[in-house]
């Protein structure tokens, strides 16, 4: 039974990584709090206060983010870092999400990101770690480049875990990077991330 549950969890995370990697270029990102739920339809209050209708696609993977310590980031870890570009060419980490091994390679690369003005997202492998009193320095390498990150001691660090549909309930904060706008204005999500234990998905 335990092995079967573990296999199911790995399969779910693999489905999630495939869905992220295959998101269309016009995908809409949704960040907000669930106001109500009606089967597959979620009413989500966005950061600007607008109520968004988010419909989960059939078999859309649901995953949770859970807080972990910065020490869980290891050399060789595949991570995503939201960051702000610095004048010296480095990036200052705003948050770090550690991908499980089953999701290695998800969205690999460096790109602009809409969490904050001028913020970036880098999904890559940690190749170097240097600790100091003011925080850590991480070097991340992806297929066609690398970036250096300054990591404050209090940075938010999370990882992913499979989640049940029952975790999608009013008051819970959610995020999806892969929603498609339908003709009626509804957003169809091919995957969704829920903040477990009151966490706001930081990406």
Give the predicted meaning of each segment.
Residues 1-5:
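Positively charged n-region of N-terminal signal peptides that target proteins for export
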Residues 19-203:
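Short, flexible, surface-exposed loop segments at domain boundaries
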Residues 8-17:
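Bacterial N-terminal signal peptides
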């Amino acid at each position: 039974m335990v092995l079967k549950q573990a296999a199911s969890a790995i399969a779910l995370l693999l489905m999630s990584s495939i869905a992220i990697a295959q998101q269309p270029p016009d995908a809409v990102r949704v960040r907000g709090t669930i106001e109500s739920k009606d089967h597959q339809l979620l009413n989500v209050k966005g950061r600007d206060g607008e109520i968004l209708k988010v419909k989960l696609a059939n078999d859309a993977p649901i995953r949770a983010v859970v807080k972990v310590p910065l020490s869980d980031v290891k050399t060789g870890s595949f991570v995503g870092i939201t960051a702000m570009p610095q004048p010296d060419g480095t990036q200052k980490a705003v948050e770090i999400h550690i991908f499980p091994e089953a999701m290695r390679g998800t969205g690999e690369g460096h790109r602009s990101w809409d969490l904050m003005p001028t913020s970036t997202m880098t999904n890559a492998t940690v190749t170097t770690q240097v600790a100091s009193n003011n925080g850590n320095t991480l070097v991340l390498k992806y297929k066609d480049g690398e970036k250096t990150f300054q990591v404050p001691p209090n940075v938010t660090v999370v990882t992913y875990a499979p989640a049940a549909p029952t975790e999608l309930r009013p008051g819970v904060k959610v995020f999806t990077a892969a929603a498609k706008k339908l003709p009626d204005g509804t957003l169809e999500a091919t995957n969704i991330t829920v903040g477990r234990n009151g966490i706001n998905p930081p990406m």
